[in-house]
């Protein structure tokens, strides 16, 4: 568990292909993650067996597909993908950012 997140003290984790992330904070039941995308970077379609996910567009814009439904989301928009729903994104602008919230925490990220 991390009670406080200090941005300047937390390095980016490079994921490759124009995507990097910072784990903001977590408990056993909840996790928040900042994910930064280069223009054209792809969050490959996938689904979670046990995690619900809410993603808030903090900057830029994304093409989002959930269960085959495609939408364009811009700064201030959000989406939810519950467990077992196929979802993915494509960044439409340089520096697009998602704030992802997962329940329960993504132990595989720690």
Swiss-Prot record:
CDD domains: cupin_KdgF. InterPro entries: Bacilysin_H2HPP_isomerase, Cupin_2, KdgF, RmlC-like_jellyroll, RmlC_Cupin_sf. Residues 35-94 form the Cupin type-2 domain. SUPFAM superfamilies: RmlC-like cupins (SSF51182). Pathway: Glycan metabolism; pectin degradation. It comes from the Bacteria. One of its GO terms (biological process) is pectin catabolic process. May have a role in pathogenicity. PANTHER family: H2HPP ISOMERASE. This is Pectin degradation protein KdgF. It comes from Dickeya dadantii (strain 3937). The gene is kdgF.
